[in-house]
C-alpha cells in the first residue's frame, strides 16, 4: 500500500488551541503516533512577552535609557528574563500535574452555539428594521420643521416665531451634536422646551408696553401657523421615544448574546473593570476572561510608560521645568516602571504596593517643589500649566493602578471553600461525638454521613464502639 508523504506545511499546521507537531526526521516510519498534540497555553497561562502590545511599553523605557542612563533598560530586561523563566517553570509544573492526573486541560467553546440564541438573533433583525424606520422618521420630521420655518421667513411679514424657531433649532442641533448620548436626535425635553419658549415669545408680544420689543418691530404669528410645527414636534417626541426604547432593547440583547470580550478595545475593557470589576464578564468563558484581563494589564502598562514619558517630555520642553521638579524624577519613574512591569509579570501585590509608594513620593516631591517655585517667583498663567497637567496625569495613573489592583484580585483569589482542594476521604472515619451519631457506627464505611476524614490523627481520635 502506497502512502503519500505529508508535506511540511501540514505537519506544522497550527489550529486554535493545538499545534500539530510531527517529527520530520522520522517521516519514513509508517505510524500514526508521530503526530502529537501540544497545548499552546493561552489566556491565564499566556506568555505575555510574545504579545505585541507589550513592546509599546519599552519605547519610553528605551528613550529614557538613552537620555538618562542605560541601566534602566537592562533592569527591565532582567525582569523580563526572570518572568519568562518563572512562566516556563509554572508551565512545567502544570504539565507534571497533568501527567499525574491532578489537572485536566480547560474546556473551551470553539464554535458559538447560534441555535441557543435563535430567537434573540431574529429579534435583533426586527429591531434593526425598526431602528432604520425610526431614523428616517426623525430625519423627515426635522427637515419638515426646518423647511416650514424658512418658508415662513419668505413671507412679507417677518414673524417672531419663525425666526426664533430657526435659532432654537440651530442652537439645539449644535448643542446635541456634542452633548447628546446618541448624537442624532432631539430629546423630548428639548422639544417641549422649544415649544414653551416660542409660546412665551408670542405671549410677551401682546404686551405692547414691553421695553424689550419696542426696538424690534414685528407682527404676531397667527395661531394656525403654530399648529403645524407643534404637531411635528409632538410626532418627533413619540418617534424619538420609540427609537430610544428600541435602541436600549437592542443593547441589552446584544450584551446578553455577546460572550467574547477579546475583540474589544483595551480602554473600554479597562473602564468596565474599573466600574464593575469582573462582574461584567460573567457571561464569558474563563479562557476569554483571562485573555481580556491580560489585555487590560498590557493597557495599564502602556499607560504608565507613556504617561511617565510625557511628564519627562514636559520637563524637557519647559524652560523652567528642571526648577519645578526634583532631579531624581527620571530615576523614580524608571523604578515605578520596573515595579509596574514586575506587577504585570509576576501578578503579585508587593510590586503594586511599591508602585503606589513611588507614585505618592513623586506627587509629593513635584507638588512641593512646584509650589516653592511659584511662591518664590512672580507666577504667570503659563507657570500653572505644568502643575495642572501633572495633576491630571497623576490622577490618571492612580486610576489605572486601581484597575490593575482589581485585575490582581481576580488573578490571585483569596483562599475560600470554592478555591480549596479537598483531598479524597480515607477508610478510617472520625466522629465528632456519639450524641450526634445515635445510630450504630460502621468504621468500615468511609462515606458515613456524620463522619469527617483525617488521615493524620485517625487512630487517636477513633471512638470505641460499644454494643449492647
UniProtKB/Swiss-Prot annotation:
Keywords: Membrane, Transmembrane, Transmembrane helix
Signal peptide: none
Transmembrane segments: 59-79, 135-155, 215-235, 297-317, 348-368, 385-405
GO cellular component: membrane
Location of the protein in the cell: Membrane
Principal location: membrane
Membrane topology label: Multi-pass membrane protein
Top-level division of the source organism's lineage: Eukaryota
The protein's name: Uncharacterized protein T28D9.4
Species this protein is from: Caenorhabditis elegans
Amino acid at each position: 500500500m502506497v502512502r503519500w508523504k505529508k508535506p511540511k506545511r501540514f505537519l506544522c499546521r497550527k489550529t486554535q488551541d493545538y499545534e500539530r507537531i510531527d517529527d520530520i526526521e522520522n517521516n519514513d516510519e509508517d505510524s500514526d503516533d508521530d503526530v502529537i498534540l501540544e497545548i499552546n497555553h493561552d489566556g491565564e497561562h499566556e506568555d505575555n512577552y510574545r504579545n505585541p502590545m507589550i513592546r509599546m511599553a519599552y519605547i519610553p523605557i528605551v528613550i529614557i535609557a538613552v537620555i538618562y542612563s542605560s541601566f534602566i533598560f537592562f533592569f527591565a530586561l532582567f525582569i523580563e528574563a526572570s518572568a519568562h523563566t518563572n512562566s516556563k517553570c509554572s508551565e512545567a509544573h502544570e504539565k507534571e500535574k497533568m501527567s499525574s492526573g491532578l489537572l485536566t486541560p480547560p474546556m473551551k467553546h470553539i464554535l458559538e452555539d447560534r441555535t441557543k440564541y435563535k430567537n434573540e438573533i431574529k429579534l435583533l433583525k426586527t429591531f434593526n428594521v425598526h431602528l432604520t424606520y425610526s431614523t428616517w422618521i426623525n430625519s423627515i420630521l426635522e427637515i419638515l420643521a426646518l423647511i416650514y420655518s424658512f418658508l415662513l421667513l419668505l413671507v412679507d411679514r417677518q414673524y417672531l416665531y419663525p425666526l426664533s424657531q430657526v435659532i432654537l433649532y440651530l442652537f439645539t442641533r449644535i448643542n446635541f451634536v456634542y452633548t447628546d448620548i446618541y448624537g442624532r436626535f432631539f430629546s423630548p425635553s428639548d422639544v417641549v422646551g422649544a415649544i414653551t419658549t416660542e409660546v412665551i415669545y408670542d405671549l410677551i408680544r401682546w404686551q405692547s408696553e414691553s421695553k424689550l420689543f419696542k426696538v424690534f418691530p414685528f407682527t404676531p404669528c397667527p395661531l394656525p401657523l403654530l399648529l403645524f410645527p407643534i404637531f411635528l414636534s409632538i410626532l418627533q417626541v413619540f418617534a424619538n421615544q420609540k427609537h430610544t426604547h428600541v435602541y436600549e432593547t437592542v443593547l441589552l440583547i446584544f450584551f446578553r448574546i455577546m460572550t467574547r470580550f477579546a475583540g474589544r478595545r483595551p480602554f473600554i475593557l479597562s473602564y468596565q473593570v474599573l466600574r464593575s470589576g469582573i462582574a461584567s464578564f460573567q457571561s464569558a468563558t474563563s479562557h476569554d476572561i483571562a485573555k481580556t484581563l491580560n489585555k487590560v494589564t498590557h493597557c495599564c502598562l502602556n499607560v504608565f510608560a507613556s504617561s511617565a514619558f510625557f511628564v519627562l517630555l514636559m520637563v524637557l520642553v519647559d524652560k523652567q521645568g528642571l526648577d519645578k521638579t526634583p532631579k531624581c524624577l527620571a530615576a523614580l519613574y524608571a523604578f515605578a516602571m520596573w515595579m509596574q512591569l514586575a506587577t504585570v509579570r509576576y501578578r503579585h501585590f508587593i510590586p503594586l504596593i511599591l508602585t503606589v509608594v513611588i507614585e505618592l513620593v513623586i506627587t509629593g516631591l513635584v507638588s512641593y517643589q512646584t509650589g516653592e517655585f511659584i511662591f518664590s517667583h512672580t507666577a504667570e498663567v503659563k507657570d500653572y500649566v505644568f502643575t495642572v497637567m501633572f495633576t491630571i496625569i497623576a490622577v490618571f495613573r492612580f486610576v489605572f493602578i486601581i484597575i490593575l489592583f482589581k485585575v490582581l484580585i481576580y488573578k490571585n483569589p483569596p483562599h475560600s471553600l470554592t478555591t480549596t482542594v479537598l483531598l479524597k476521604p480515607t477508610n478510617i472515619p472520625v466522629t465528632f461525638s456519639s450524641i450526634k451519631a445515635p445510630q450504630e457506627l460502621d468504621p468500615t464505611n468511609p462515606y458515613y454521613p456524620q463522619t469527617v476524614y483525617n488521615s493524620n490523627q485517625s487512630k487517636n481520635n477513633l471512638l470505641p464502639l460499644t454494643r449492647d
